[in-house]
């Protein structure tokens, strides 16, 4: 309960941008200004708020890594960034600022690295970086997007999830409806 409260309070406070990677992407979806008119919470105001994603506590229990998704209603897409803060909610820092949708961040190597999924290489692959966001390295080169992963206890092996095409998809049958998902 205390950890959840710290995470919530830390996410509400402005993060300090330290060692933030800039992509030069002018269409980067990030934190928006929330505008509440006439004291009413509108759908636009709700979409302007970031959505906290998964969080993971460091092995020593002192730090928390978590993600926040930001949305663009006009573009109909989102982007997720990685943050690190102390377990008490202090020293909240955004460690990524890219258009590559980093997610699933977890501590590895005794808390000296953060593993995460990112589509910087063209499809979602497994990456690692330092807790300050520096020294990003790709760890996987799977032929397709990785949707989830789990390291073995000794961190020598990785189990990952990826969708494999089986049969005909809706988009294969109806190419004029590329966003359709049901039959």
Where are these regions (language model features)?
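C-terminal motif of bacterial Sec signal peptides marking the signal peptidase cleavage site
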Residues: 9-11
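Hydrophobic beta-strand positions that form the internal "hydrophobic ladder"
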Residues: 61-65, 95, 111-115, 158-159
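Multi-bladed beta-propeller domains
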Residues: 28-51, 77, 85-101, 118, ...
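Beta-strand-rich domains and repeat architectures in extracellular enzymes and scaffolds
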Residues: 44-80
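Short glycine/acidic-enriched loop and turn motifs that connect beta-strands
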Residues: 70-74, 120-123, 165-168
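Bacterial signal peptide processing site
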Residues: 13-15
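Predominantly five- to eight-bladed beta-propeller fold
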Residues: 18-29, 80, 161-183
